[in-house]
Design a protein with these regions (language model features):
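Bacterial N-terminal signal peptides
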Residues: 13-21
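Sec-dependent signal peptide cleavage junction
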Residues: 20-34
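Extracytoplasmic
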Residues: 33-37, 64, 81-83, 90-94, ...
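Solvent-exposed loop/turn segments at secondary-structure junctions
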Residues: 45-48, 76, 102-104, 153-156
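Surface-exposed binding/hinge segments that line
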Residues: 98, 131-170
Length: 170
């Protein structure tokens, strides 16, 4: 009987030791004076940051590496992000997004409506998923506004542009 108690205590002790040995503490090391690099620890990540190549763009936006014109808040409502506001025509074929001023890309370049237009056009050229969201005829810049001209009405255009496929890249 004493032999069984010793075995149980030994087994429990080994189980605890194995459990605690599997936990580790990790700490990023780097030059505290460096302002050019950030280290992020993640459990998984896409093998590319290109939003049109794989459907891992949600990861990119989740880690705050890229942003869209609109986004969903914690209640699932569409709210402004890189666009300050938006409006649409009565027929639902023309959508105007006012592009936020004072935004910089990670390389320090200012984000302009022309750059946003080029980013959306790039996405439309590279991804065959764009028609699943909207039927784009053309894009036009008017001051701080980016105007989407659609071939068919789309009542959810602001929601479509919250999808990370439409991350604004420079």
């Amino acid at each position: 009987m004493r032999n069984n108690v010793v075995k149980k205590v030994l087994a429990a002790t080994l189980a605890c030791m194995m459990t605690f040995s599997m936990t580790t503490v990790a700490q990023a090391k780097g030059d505290k004076n460096s302002d050019k690099e950030i280290t992020i620890g993640v459990t998984s990540f896409a093998d590319t940051l290109e939003p049109t190549e794989q459907y891992f763009s949600w990861v990119v936006s989740r880690y705050a590496i890229g942003e869209c014109l609109t986004k969903f808040d914690e209640h699932g409502e569409i709210v402004p992000c890189l666009a300050e506001e938006w409006d649409n025509s009565e027929d639902g074929k023309t959508w105007t997004f006012k592009i936020r001023e004072g935004v910089k890309f990670s390389n320090g370049d200012d984000m302009t409506p022309e750059m946003v237009k080029a980013s959306i056009e790039r996405t439309a050229e590279k991804s065959d998923r764009v028609p699943e969201f909207f039927d784009l005829d053309s894009l036009e810049v008017d001051g701080q506004n980016l105007i989407f001209h659609l071939n068919r009405a789309n009542a959810n255009m602001a929601g479509c542009l919250a999808d990370p496929l439409f991350l604004i890249v420079d």
